[in-house]
Design a protein with these regions (language model features):
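Bacterial signal peptide processing site
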Residues: 25-27
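Hydrophobic/aromatic-rich core segments of domains that either
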Residues: 98-154
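Mid-length scaffold segments of soluble, non-membrane domains
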Residues: 73-115
Length: 184
């Protein structure tokens, strides 16, 4: 189990308050605003995956900065760090994403720095090339599935999700998702 220092705890509380302020500006796409049938199917699989995680009798899932502190301070079956959500979401939506003819990959921002954050990207490769994902506009079909922030199946336009980070120390990178043997 990794212990955090008092300074890290104070920084986490500060970041949490910043996230509350940021959350008022950038919000997830509302379910009723999703018109693309493929994304609607992905959203249903995403919602089911989050529900399954939160109701899993073998693991205790949490979310957000307070969830991070909970996971880091307790041993056992606690889950909820952003990379753990990334793996769980990837596993839960992969077959649905592929059935829609879409692709998925991982994304990380601030890799190796304070505020590192992981999530899953889904996109329609017929409408945007993989090499262009990080430069997508709101009008392009590139979406972030991020259950970590609120423990809910939140979907963001990638261009908006990138603005949620208060400080970008390391630019966003696409990453392959390889399921670990254990989420610990």
């Amino acid at each position: 189990m990794r212990k955090i220092t008092a300074n890290q705890f104070i920084q986490s509380c500060f970041l949490l308050s910043c996230l509350f302020l940021t959350a008022c500006v950038i919000t997830p796409i509302q379910r009723d605003d999703i018109n693309d049938p493929a994304l609607q199917n992905i959203q249903r699989a995403f919602s089911q995956t989050v529900s399954d995680a939160l109701n899993d009798p073998d693991e205790d899932w949490t979310s957000g900065w307070l969830g991070n502190m909970w996971v880091n301070f307790h041993e056992g079956k606690q889950r909820g760090l952003c990379y753990q959500w990334k793996y769980r979401i990837h596993t839960g939506v992969k077959s649905t994403v592929h059935a829609q003819g879409w692709q998925l990959t991982g994304i990380v921002i601030n890799k190796g720095a304070d505020g590192e954050h992981h999530a899953v990207i889904v996109y329609d490769p017929k409408r945007i090339q993989t090499a262009q994902l990080l430069h997508a506009t709101v009008k392009q079909p590139v979406f972030v599935l991020d259950a970590w922030r609120q423990g809910m199946p939140d979907i963001y336009f990638l261009s908006e999700w990138l603005q949620l980070a208060r400080h970008i120390r390391v630019p966003a990178q696409l990453i392959n998702i390889k399921q670990p043997v254990s989420l610990n």
